[in-house]
Amino acid sequence: AEKICIFFYEDGSRGRDVLTHFLGDAELKSIMTDGYNAYVFIGDELKSAQFKDTIHQVCMSHANNKFVKAANQGGEPNAVLFSNDLKEFFIREHLYDDAGLTSEERLRQRQSLKTKEIVIRVRSRLDAELAKEPEFRSQYYTEALHYLNHFWNELFAFLDDGELPIDNNLAERC
């Protein structure tokens, strides 16, 4: 399938008004963001009539990068475990791409027992880490954990639809 990348920049701002003006009355299946505060409202304010069915996704690469930073700069060994698990999703997505899977076939793979095992492992580890005293974690690790927890549904929305991407790297690399 042909992939489309749109880069939009207006008056030096990434604010809400820029996004809502740009989107106008477009009908979108999904929109992916990086968790930037101005875009968090997508789940609420943009759920007007034309956006009520729009799926808000958050880029998995951004989540993974937070754990990489927590491991490398924060010295958090458990951050590596999260990063390795999140990378499993990327590995699986590359395999689906290489196999030329249709969106229906991709969805079946995303719904597989192996995928569910990874999700359960990540969620269990996340809950266990969040239950620990925060003063014993680095700032980077705390940020990564809270990001993953806060955007859990948006990060894993791709698992429920074979057409949705796992990340917005295509747009990031334009």
Model feature map: region roles:
Residues 1-174:
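Catalytic center-proximal scaffold of phosphoryl-transfer enzymes
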